Design a protein with these regions (language model features):
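Short hydrophobic clusters on alpha-helical segments that form packing/core surfaces
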Residues: 33-41, 65, 83, 87, ...
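Hydrophobic alpha-helical connector segments
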Residues: 78, 92-119
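C-terminal effector-binding regulatory domain of bacterial HTH transcription factors
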Residues: 215-244
Length: 244
């Protein structure tokens, strides 16, 4: 799978460290640099990558890299944010063939799809699950997880009649964090998320959510309106991640 490019509207905001590309040509150059960074990270640890190497891999002058990224960590954060968007879009893609009939099955299907995505993108595995994750990259990862948790609640509501559960978004975020921890263990031992550890992580998330969810949730007819509601613009996350 080739990396999806960011549009100008999707480019990271200044508070995420990298300079925001403002024009079409700048956006194109920005995505070229992120593509190069991803290729390098797929084969090398972040400590072994320099801005000069990114420039060489992208076949652009080093000054062009400095225009967007003051240091290599800024490039890694920008790449993490791009991965966040791709992972988010994957996470909200409807499950229609077949549709899940239980909430436990829904989680298995969503998690299997997420694991397949990350296993297909070695740089994403290294950035999010590697031992040397920087604080800035980790914060970017957490911001992405918060957005996924908000949409995950709406995903549940699209497929099932669900009772009111206080702080359900936060419960979903905790379940996701526990899954990430087991995936990181798998990555550390095997270099990818194995199916065994994927199932273990999903089982852990299900056991945790059983503290709050009934074992059985009645299905509801899937509607286009409910599916459209799942998407949350990233701009809505800035002030209050748990706002509905």
């Amino acid at each position: 799978m080739e990396p999806a490019g960011l549009t100008d509207a999707q480019a990271p905001r200044p508070d995420f460290s990298p300079s925001r590309p403002m024009r079409k040509r700048g956006v194109e150059r920005y995505n070229i640099l992120l593509d190069a960074t991803e290729r390098l990270l797929a084969d090398s640890s972040d400590e072994d990558i320099s801005l000069a190497q990114i420039a060489d891999a992208a076949e652009v002058p080093l000054a062009s890299v400095y225009h967007f990224f003051p240091n290599r960590n800024a490039a890694f954060v920008a790449l993490a944010l791009r991965f966040n968007e791709e992972i988010y879009q994957t996470s909200i893609t409807p499950l229609t063939d077949p549709e899940p009939q239980t909430w436990q099955e829904l989680l298995h299907m969503i998690h299997a799809r997420a694991a397949a995505f990350q296993n297909g993108r070695p740089a994403a595995l290294r950035l999010f699950l590697g031992a040397g994750v920087s604080v800035a990259v980790r914060n970017a990862d957490l911001s992405g997880n918060a957005r996924i948790a908000r949409s995950r609640e709406r995903f549940f509501e699209a497929y099932f009649h669900i009772p009111f559960i206080p702080d359900f978004v936060e419960r979903l975020e905790v379940a996701g964090a526990s899954m990430d921890g087991i995936w990181a263990l798998s990555y550390g031992r095997h270099g990818h998320v194995t199916e065994h550890y994927r199932q273990e992580a999903t089982a852990g998330a299900i056991d945790y959510l059983r503290r709050f969810l009934p074992e059985f949730l009645p299905r509801k007819p899937l509607t286009q309106k409910a599916l459209e509601r799942i998407f949350i613009p990233i701009e809505h996350m800035a002030a209050n991640p748990f706002a509905r």
